[in-house]
Amino acid sequence: MSPLSTLHLRPFFQGFAVVSLIALAGCGLSSSREVAKPEAAAVAAPLSELSSQPVQGALVKRMALPAPMTARLMAQDSTAMAYRSEPREQYANLPDNPVHRVAETPVSTFSVDVDTGSYANVRRFLNEGRLPPDGAVRLEEMVNYFPYGYALPTDGSPFGVTTEVAATPWNPDTQLLRIGIKASDRAVAQLAPANLVFLVDVSGSMDRPEGLPLVKSTLKLLVDQLREQDRVSLVVYAGESRVVLKPTSGRDKAKIRNAIDRLTAGGSTAGASGIELAYQMAREGFIDNGINRILLATDGDFNVGVSDFDSLKQMAVDRRKSGVSLTTLGFGVDNYNEHLMEQLADAGDGNYAYIDNLREARKVLVDQLSSTLAIVARDVKLQVEFNPAQVSEYRLLGYENRALKREDFNNDKVDAGEIGAGHTVTALYEIVPKGKKGWIEPLRYAGEPSASGSSAELAMLRVRYKPAAGGESRLIERPISNASGKASDDLRFSAAVAAFAQQLKGDGRYTGSMSLSDTAALARSARGDDPFGLRNEFVQLVEMAQALKH
């Protein structure tokens, strides 16, 4: 069987299973219980469409990346379609940030976000021959998936700040303002001792190749990185929760691996009781001045005990006060509760990643282990004050669920995002320079706003954060020059990712006539130094989306 035939197997089996279920329904099988559906994932493309020349070309390019699933695993996967035929993936649909007139709202405030789960999840949809639902696309997580060459701190602060202004590729009348933050890095050997609790969902919904088997392989990658001073506990939950492994030294790697290997899936999902028990184990193994973190591996399909969103989120908020962070690692398809996974990590002062293959697991838990585990700054907030003499309108690209009130910036009681060692954070504003055509009609009776400060300043950037050890917040202020020039590769590439995220949502109200072909060309020309092939992979994903949209 050719590799291309193997890549076509999943849509074929999915189509076969759906036809089989329709036939059964026609024989009189019915249900009186009507299930309320959250936003459904996009339906798989027809086989004829996936066999077209554009899609085949895009799929062939993907062969250079991690190998596809074997035919045997795909066949096993198809046997579970009876409960997978009704997509139950849950996403939060947030409207795009609005356009603001500087004369009316000169200040923009938001919390940083270092999550990257949206990008990996979107990649999963495209690799399956499907376009992602709108709610799965979070622009800031897609942009922040990639590393950028930002300046490191030189003044003793935990991160450096970079700004850049250049032309917008999709609108000749606007400019892109890029704000970049680069946290100081640390080698794994330099990290404080770690007390880690692996909290694993072993319920029936995880009994599939991309569920528990991938979780086990992922956790064993992390086990290989453990040091003697680290300790690990293993807690599992299905219908009930239990401790599989008490706090164990990182030197006992064989013992930890054996405990992971023995895990099997089956039963309902009492996620809340598992989280409670995991925090209990974290307290039992707590390391003063160390890294204390729970890593929750699940599809988020909680259905026993406390399962409502607000109660689970409040539980994470309450427990973070104990000094234990919560990282969520998303696995699985069809019943995946992405909204819960992202919000639990935010509430638990952790980070969220989606693991769609072992390569992504290595990126998160090996290549970026220091970023995943070690916090260098807490409650990081960004505030931009635009100069009305230079800018008439602006909009923040992404960060819709991170918006803060202006007064929240100076309030240390308001929670915000954490930044890990080596993390990069990117924020993009699309701005309308004074005198250029904007999105909003000018007011008839409004007077011209007066400039304050230096007229050469485009804006003032303020960054507020707390040290990793806690305490009062500190402030960094940087004026942003109105000088714009040739865009760097980093800005051009991040602009391509931002364009792609907007194009996937489909309405094109901001990206105008810029096509997916234009986006792929821009990203291809801005790949620069790409040691891990991440930017090249992005180009291929854009090409796949282009084929699927035709």
Language-model features, listed with the residues they occupy:
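Sec-dependent signal peptide recognition
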Residues: 11-18
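Soluble, acidic/polar mature domains that operate outside membranes
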Residues: 73-78, 384-398
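Long, acidic serine/threonine- and proline-rich intrinsically disordered regions
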Residues: 101-104, 108, 117-123, 374-378, ...
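Residue-level recognition of well-ordered beta-strand positions that form the cores
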Residues: 113, 162-164, 180-182, 199, ...
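C-terminal motif of bacterial Sec signal peptides marking the signal peptidase cleavage site
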Residues: 23-26
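Subset of Sec-pathway N-terminal targeting signals
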Residues: 28-186, 512-550
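N-terminal secretory signal peptides that target proteins for export/translocation
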Residues: 1-11
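Exposed acidic/Ser/Thr-rich ligand/metal-binding surfaces
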Residues: 28-41, 160-380, 407, 440-452, ...
